[in-house]
Amino acid sequence: MAQAGSADPGVGGHWAAGPRCAPWRWALALLWLATAAGGPSRRQWPVPYKRFSFRPEPDPYCQAKYTFCPTGSPIPVMKGDDVIEVFRLQTPVWEFKYGNLLGHLKIMHDAIGFKSTLTGKNYTMEWYELFQLGNCTFPHLRPEMNAPFWCNQGAACFFEGIDDIHWKENGTLVLVATISGNTFNQMAKWVKRDNETGIYYETWTVQASPTKGAETWFESYDCSKFVLRTYKKLAELGAEFKKIETNYTRIFLYSGEPTYLGNETSIFGPTGNKTLALAIKRFYYPFKPHLSTKEFLLSILQIFDAVIIHREFYLFYNFEYWFLPMKFPFIKITYEEIPLPKRNETLSGL
């Protein structure tokens, strides 16, 4: 995303005009200048998620505690006349390790299941972090680097099979639609493009307040958003979804209008803002991983002081830094209904 700046008011006309022309020319000039100067500051909210032309190779420094997509396989090409069942899959985050612990807090992970009628094979498709959630939410402060170092990538994972117990025991496994093999193949091409261009994970949804219709400053980009994008694409391709309730976890931050600060070079580079750079690193320091119990408790107090008492939060979005003037209630986890999409009636027979 381009950095906002004031437009160059290079006026081509001559302001040294005769007395009778001066008033209206001055008025037009001032109006033009006001429009030009004010235009870039009126940002688009929410800030659009930046897409890329390719997915970069991860830095070797970034290591996953749990291997990403260990049994992944290419998405198969289905026969056009196959009938594919589409399943909504949802389970508590880290259910494989903690069971239903996070399910009580409605912190859920979402995925999509498919079953081919012709072959009887099942498949799972999900989108999640390459290096776990903490690395996608907060950076590493490496002594040899001036700028915070981010291990933040998310990607799609497709593999054969659906672990029924994993999804059913504490979550959801329910049929939501039936599509043709042709529609599945079209979806697969879209998934490939989506995965190559949407490369990083975003934990937070940032809004002005919890009230309905409040301004949204930034949207999250996570597992549930991938599922919602895929459902929307299937509906565009003609899929008809069942009328069932579907809820999703969202983690909100609440703030006044964000202030754009700059990117890594403009803040942490040789000619960067040293005061701002230090403030950002101080903010992120309590979030560092591998803490002892004593360090962890101290960090909680430091985070409380920064976010609640001083009402400050530094957000990294689109590889750029923003300042959030935090507002009550500061942070909230919700489990909201987002309806399944309606079929595109202009595309029949798909």
UniProtKB/Swiss-Prot annotation:
Keywords: Disulfide bond, Glycoprotein, Hydrolase, Lysosome, Membrane, Neurodegeneration, Neuronal ceroid lipofuscinosis, Signal-anchor, Transferase, Transmembrane, Transmembrane helix. The gene is CLN5. GO terms for biological process: brain development; glycosylation; lysosomal lumen acidification; lysosome organization; neurogenesis; positive regulation of GTP binding; retrograde transport, endosome to Golgi; signal peptide processing. Belongs to the CLN5 family. Disulfide bonds join 62-151, 69-157. GO terms for cellular component: cytosol; endoplasmic reticulum; Golgi apparatus; lysosomal membrane; lysosome; membrane; perinuclear region of cytoplasm; vacuolar lumen. Residues 43-350 are lumenal. Exhibits palmitoyl protein thioesterase (S-depalmitoylation) activity in vitro and most likely plays a role in protein S-depalmitoylation. The chain crosses the membrane at residues 26-42. PANTHER family: CEROID-LIPOFUSCINOSIS NEURONAL PROTEIN 5 (PTHR15380:SF2), CEROID-LIPOFUSCINOSIS, NEURONAL 5 (PTHR15380). It catalyses: S-hexadecanoyl-L-cysteinyl-[protein] + H2O = L-cysteinyl-[protein] + hexadecanoate + H(+). It is linked to Defects in CLN5 are the cause of neuronal ceroid lipofuscinosis (NCL). NCL is characterized by brain atrophy and the accumulation of lysosome derived fluorescent storage bodies in neurons and most other cells. NCL is found in Border collie dogs. One of its GO terms (molecular function) is hydrolase activity, acting on glycosyl bonds. Residues 1-25 are cytoplasmic. N-glycosylated with both high mannose and complex type sugars. Glycosylation is important for proper folding and trafficking to the lysosomes. Can undergo proteolytic cleavage at the C-terminus, probably by a cysteine protease and may involve the removal of approximately 10-15 residues from the C-terminal end. Multimer. Interacts with SORT1, RAB5A and RAB7A. Interacts with PPT1, TPP1, CLN3, CLN6, CLN8, ATP5F1A and ATP5F1B. InterPro entries: CLN5. This is Bis(monoacylglycero)phosphate synthase CLN5. It comes from Canis lupus familiaris. Its EC number is 2.3.1.-, 3.1.2.22. Residues 296-335 are annotated as: Membrane-anchoring. Glycans are attached at residues 122, 135, 170, 195, 247, 263, 273, 344. The active site is at residues 109, 223.
